[in-house]
Amino acid sequence: MSDFSPIAGRAPRLAVLIDADNVTARNASAILDEIASFGEPSVRRVYGDWSSSALTQWKEQARDLGLVMHQQSANTKGKNASDIGLVIDAMDILHAGKVDGFVLVSSDSDFTRLASRIREDGLQVIGIGEAKTPESLRKVCNRFVLIENIVSGSDTPTQPKSGRTSDVQAVKEPPLKAIPFILDAMKKIDPDQDDYSLGHLGQAITQLHPDFDPRTYGSSRLSDLLRKIERFEVFTQGSSVKVRDKA
């Protein structure tokens, strides 16, 4: 699942910056497990006003998961203080040059410019947030992962439980809805090509649609999703896995 390649025989070092005001504490462990698939979270910080009773659960999770809590008092009018503190720290980390990429955990569009600025320096940005996250933040990241996909698994399509609005709950889409994204990627690679490398196809999909995730369609992997769609054929050619559009 990782979009990062090993660097000098080691896993990429990631700066994980969490906006506690916009992420539910109960999902913290699952989110960190997801992040581990991309690299080593060498910087692990969570931002919020820790004097607020609303972040009690986050305090417990931070201690259990080894997250460094950064205090941001809510004394800034017109702008969330946690946002400002996170952005300042992110720029300090960026200029220090000790990490290979960033993971921004928030559903707040205010971090769109930060993600863009980090990418301008050649580092990759992974965004993690809820389905309510605006397109502006999703699209500026190299990869954007929905918390609903992280915590719900990839089983059969589900509907959100009534009366549980505080819990993120994935609504799985039918596999056929993934077809336009797959065809976009094939066109990007070569519209006249007969067969496509599964790996290259996955990379092209992510480049065009950073928030694409097979789990949205009830599959844990792209190959599993493709096999559910009759239009596509997945086959092995030598040591490579290939995909063909039969239409």
Model-derived regions, located:
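Short, ordered loop/turn segments at secondary-structure junctions
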Residues: 20, 74-75, 107, 130-131, ...
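Helical mechanochemical/support elements of P-loop NTPase systems and associated helical scaffolds
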Residues: 16, 24-27, 31, 54-58, ...
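A residue-level signal for conserved active-site and pocket-lining positions in enzyme catalytic cores
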Residues: 19, 46, 90, 104, ...
